[in-house]
Amino acid sequence: MTTTATAAELGSRPVPPLGGFSFTVLKLEIRRLLRNRRTVIFALVTPSIFFLLFGLNAAYANESAGKGNVSAFILISMALYGSVLATTSGGAMISIERAQGWTRQLRLTPLSPLAYVVTKMLTSMVLGFVSVLAVYIVGFATHKPSMPGYLWIVTALCVWIGSLVFAPFGLFLGYLLPTENVMQFMGFIMILLAFGGGLFVPLSQYPHTLQVLAKFTPLYGVNQLVHWPLTGGSMDMWWVVNAVAWLAIFTVGAIWRFRKDTARV
């Protein structure tokens, strides 16, 4: 059977419900991800260390910040960094599957590009949840962050949901970059985005031009939204527009690269 004949058969194959999305496949993907100890440990340890370094500083940790203190503000920031790092890392692991030829084999199945991207995004979100939980446990154990009890839950959920924006970004990088370089590039890119979105340094300390440019970066909207329950004030709809727009851009990019990669079968 020729490749052309196979492609013709695939084209006439009926599309299954939900584009081939399967909870069985989702469970397998989650297990595969959690077995990667290096990625899991990196996602858990890095943001927790950052919080311990910056969130416990006696010079400012107890200063007021909205409904809590600065330590609580930094806790949310580091949890967000860890969560987006985890979801991006989980997605970027697709580069390993590409090297093994797995994604090309998927072209022989009825699984749609959107269903595959959604499966990978949900898998990455599991790692993101574990990362958020780890940072919040460390923060709670130090007794330094101060905010109302309900905000511990609300902000943690906001951080986790907000990290969804970066799940398809990891997939996009995994399809775009070579296997041997994807993690190095990803780490560098995430640090730049964190600074650009005001995650490590308050945007108020940036020059005016950088403050304006920051509003168009991928982490800006999510960063503002996850801190809003703590800081209060009026919500800027641009935060939502920014987050939704980048989620759409990254998702379209991931689907495009998936189709381009599997089209080589």
Where are the predicted features?
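Alpha-helical transmembrane segments and their short interhelical loops
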Residues: 113-187, 233-244, 248-255
